[in-house]
Curated annotation (Swiss-Prot):
Keywords: Acyltransferase, Calcium, Cell membrane, Endoplasmic reticulum, Glycoprotein, Golgi apparatus, Lipid biosynthesis, Lipid droplet, Lipid metabolism, Membrane, Phospholipid biosynthesis, Phospholipid metabolism, Repeat, Signal-anchor, Transferase, Transmembrane, Transmembrane helix. A motif (Di-lysine motif) lies at residues 514-517. Residues 443-478 form the EF-hand domain. Glycans are attached at N207, N511. It comes from Danio rerio (Zebrafish). Pathway: Lipid metabolism; phospholipid metabolism. This is Lysophosphatidylcholine acyltransferase 1. Residues 1-52 are cytoplasmic. It is found in: Endoplasmic reticulum membrane; Golgi apparatus membrane; Cell membrane; Lipid droplet. Its EC number is 2.3.1.23, 2.3.1.51, 2.3.1.25, 2.3.1.67. Belongs to the 1-acyl-sn-glycerol-3-phosphate acyltransferase family.
Length: 517
């Protein structure tokens, strides 16, 4: 796959977000420290960090008996009138939680806008979701949230969670999704009797460089929602907790080492859905997302929680941060191709591609190969692979295998060998290995000469699938170890820009620079 230089259509779903379409990989977060910042962190680690950590733990322990007493004898399926002593417990818990956040450096929490009453907006939609620190507005409002059922069994934390009456999702119950939606609808239709439900519709954490696709759960009830946007206007972003980046404890450590941590919570006007939006939760979600993106000054892009699997996949062919396979996955999903892909379908695609014997297709030929009309999405997919107006459909099949089977890299490599290998000995040459790895990683440039020579220990000028697999077992990080990506990364870094909150690598295969109309 390659990075076309031409400017293409944005990934924004229908409308003006009022911002530049210069996207970054939302699932990747990197931190780069200056020497002075490293020195500051070192000093804070042995002075302020342990004090803050101990005090925060103490405040959580202090909150536990209040939450425990308040939940004793309380019905899980009905809401009783709030008694005076439970009201006092609610105030005490809010004060304790605020003290805990204060001890962590969140000295000022700026709140803009007017929070709606539960009767006005039973659901709060909050974005962008970037960290466990997004719990700050939850503890300030004591609104209900949607959480996995296993959370209530965690000592101390589980009791605090049960106090806010969350909607629990059970991973072991295959019918859990339907039950969760029904419970949200039941509470949202209670005319303000239940506490508001605070939902993060993105469904996963990102680096706040854009708003990804909203899940429809918050919008299926068809009731008014209040959009709430979060900002962390810090000089250094130690908040973001993404699929590729610092781990949970490192984020906690670095954040507690900052002298001040700023957070802004802005309540936007309540959004009442139209009759059309009530019938179409996806449209409802899209329109709310557009309003939130405009308030944040961020682009919107149709990546989803499912795309995180690409970022999570481990192994020798772990995707680099600047891969354009995320864009490919979005386009494939847009065409409805991903749901139709099975192992058998991929094998059939590979056979069809091999029968072309390396013959390259133009855009019309590619559309016919996909059995799709000539749409914008088909043109965008073609642009990811084309060189001089032609493409090798084998590259498309490899990319399709990666996005549909992100955790089965060996199956993808085996499929690629089937399409490229010589019939007499099942081997491929260096140029073919380059194409396979470039496509499987979703990059535009790759240096594999050193890697190929290492695999081809007998200097035959070709390698087999078994030889590559054997080498992968000995060298699980072969792409990084043999510096295959160094040239591509350096070239891409020169084209990338860093954000004010840390460094987030660009991933789009396009040079997004035009404004949306």
């Amino acid at each position: 796959m390659r990075f076309p230089n031409r400017k293409l259509h944005t990934a924004v779903n229908g409308g003006d977000s009022g911002v530049s379409t210069h996207f970054r990989n939302p699932f990747v977060h990197e931190l780069r420290f200056t020497t002075l910042q490293k020195l500051k962190i070192a000093v804070m680690t042995v002075t302020l960090f342990p004090v803050r950590l101990l005090f925060a733990a103490f405040m959580m322990l202090l909150a536990w008996p209040f939450a425990f007493v308040a939940t004793v004898g309380r019905s899980e399926n009905a809401v009783e009138p709030l008694s005076w002593w439970r009201w006092l417990v609610d105030l005490a818990l809010k004060a304790i939680m605020r003290a805990m956040w204060f001890s962590g450096g969140f000295h000022w929490v700026r709140v803009k806008g007017r929070p709606a009453l539960p009767s006005e907006a039973p659901i709060l939609t909050m974005a962008p979701h970037s960290s466990y620190f997004d719990a700050i507005p939850v503890t300030m409002t004591m609104a209900s949230i949607v959480m996995k059922a296993e959370s209530k069994d965690i000592p101390v934390w589980g009791t605090l969670i049960k106090f806010i009456r969350p909607v629990f999702v059970s991973r072991s119950d295959q019918d859990s999704r339907r039950k969760t939606v029904e419970e949200i609808k039941r509470r949202a239709s209670s005319n303000g009797e239940w506490p508001q439900i605070m939902i993060f519709p993105e469904g996963t954490c990102t680096n706040r460089s854009c708003l990804i696709a909203f899940k429809p759960g918050a919008f299926i009830p068809g009731v008014p929602v209040q959009p709430v946007v979060l900002r962390y206007p810090n000089e250094l972003d130690t908040i973001s907790w993404t699929w590729q980046g610092p781990g949970a404890f490192k984020i906690l450590w670095l954040t507690l080492c900052q002298l001040h941590n700023f957070v802004e919570i802005e309540y936007l006007p309540t959004y009442t859905p139209s009759e059309e939006e009530k019938k179409d939760p996806a449209l409802f979600a899209s329109n709310v997302r557009r309003i939130m993106a405009k308030a944040l000054g961020l682009p919107i892009i149709d990546y989803s929680f499912e795309d995180c699997q690409l970022a999570m996949a481990k192994g020798p062919l772990r995707l680099p941060k600047h891969t354009c396979l995320l864009e490919f996955a979005r386009l494939v999903r847009l065409l409805g191709l991903k749901t139709k892909v099975t192992d058998e379908v991929l094998q059939e695609e590979a056979c069809s591609a091999r029968q072309l014997c390396g013959r390259r297709l133009d855009m019309e030929g590619f559309a016919q190969y996909l059995h799709q009309p000539m749409t914008e999405a088909v043109q965008d997919i073609f642009s990811l692979f084309e060189e001089h107006g032609m493409m090798d459909v084998r590259e498309y099949v490899i990319a399709l295998s990666v996005v549909c089977r992100p955790f089965r890299y060996l199956d993808t490599v085996k499929l690629a060998f089937r399409m490229f290998e010589a019939q007499e000995d099942g081997a491929i040459v260096e140029d073919e290995l380059t194409v396979i790895l470039k496509t499987a990683l979703g990059v535009g440039d790759l240096a594999v000469s050193e890697l190929f020579r290492a695999i081809d220990s007998q200097d035959k000028g070709k390698i087999t699938f078994d030889e590559l697999c054997s080498f992968m077992e000995k060298c699980p990080d072969l792409v990084e170890q043999y510096h295959c990506l160094c040239e591509s990364i350096s070239q891409h870094s020169r084209e990338s820009t860093s954000s004010s909150n840390g460094f987030c690598a660009d991933f789009s295969p396009r040079n997004h620079s035009k404004k949306q109309d």
